C-alpha cells in the first residue's frame, strides 16, 4: 500500500510541476496491475490514505481477478462434498468452476457501492445498470442513517 501511495504522490508531484492543475488530477490505484494476493484488498482498505493525497479517486475493480478469487474461495467453502456409495470409488473433485468475468458483475456492483460510500469520485465498470442500482441503494441507506442520527 505504501509503495502505491508513494508512487501516486510522486506522479502527482510531477504532474503539478509540469503545470497540470491539481483539480484536474484523478488518482487510480491500478487494481489488478502488478499486484497479487491481498494487495488489491489492502489498497481498497486504505482508501482513506488515498483520499488524503487530496485528489479525486477512481476505482476500476470491475470483473477483476481479485474479485474472482474471493468469489471462488467462497464458492469452494460452500460446496458440499458428495460421497459416493460404499465401494463406488473415490470422491469426485468438488471444486466449483471458477467464476467467469461476466459472472463477477454482482461483486463488481457491490464493490462499487462500498467504495462510493467511502467517497470515491468514480468507478469504472463493465455493466453499468446494476452498478447504478447498487450505488443508489447504498446512498439511500446512508442518507437515511445520517438523517436519523441528527
Task: Identify what each model region corresponds to.
Residues 30:
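Active-site pre-Tyr helix/loop in NAD(P)-dependent dehydrogenases
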Amino acid at each position: 500500500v505504501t509503495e502505491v501511495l508513494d508512487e501516486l504522490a510522486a506522479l502527482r508531484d510531477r504532474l503539478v510541476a509540469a503545470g497540470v492543475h491539481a483539480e484536474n488530477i484523478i488518482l487510480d490505484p491500478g487494481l489488478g496491475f502488478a499486484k497479487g494476493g491481498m494487495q488489491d484488498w489492502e489498497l481498497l482498505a486504505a482508501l482513506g490514505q488515498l483520499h488524503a493525497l487530496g485528489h479525486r479517486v477512481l476505482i476500476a475493480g470491475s470483473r477483476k481477478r481479485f474479485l474472482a478469487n474471493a468469489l471462488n474461495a467462497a464458492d469452494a467453502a460452500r460446496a458440499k462434498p458428495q460421497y459416493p456409495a460404499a465401494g463406488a470409488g473415490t470422491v469426485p473433485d468438488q471444486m466449483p468452476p471458477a467464476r467467469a468475468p461476466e459472472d463477477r458483475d454482482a461483486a463488481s456492483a457491490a464493490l462499487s457501492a462500498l467504495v462510493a460510500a467511502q467517497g470515491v469520485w468514480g468507478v469504472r465498470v463493465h455493466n453499468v445498470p446494476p452498478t447504478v442500482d447498487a450505488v443508489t441503494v447504498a446512498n439511500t441507506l446512508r442518507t437515511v442513517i445520517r438523517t436519523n442520527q441528527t
